Amino acid sequence: MEFAGNKSVITPEAVFIIGTYDENGVPNAMNAAWAMQSDMNEITVMLSKHKTTENFEKTGAFTVAFGTADTVLISDYFGVETGKKVNKIEKAGCHVHKSAHVNAPIIE
């Protein structure tokens, strides 16, 4: 095995799209690159302050989807735009429906 050198980041990583509703029921989503499966039925997501994390703190619920090659543009957009200034779901042209399991959106 060849020495890869000192690297501070290991890539590529899975991109998680975290979906939440705000206190008015408006859906929001963010791109969370710092996430991983930490147990058989558990994920760990490291988040700083974002509109999505504020929503989660208020509602206690979120959904997780995976960014894929088919959703790369929308996934990237969810990571570069702030939900504090615009409705990212609406601006991206996405449709959502409420999860049957938690009070959070499923992005279609």
Regions found by a protein language model. Name each.
Residues 1-30, 36-108:
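Active-site-proximal mixed secondary-structure blocks
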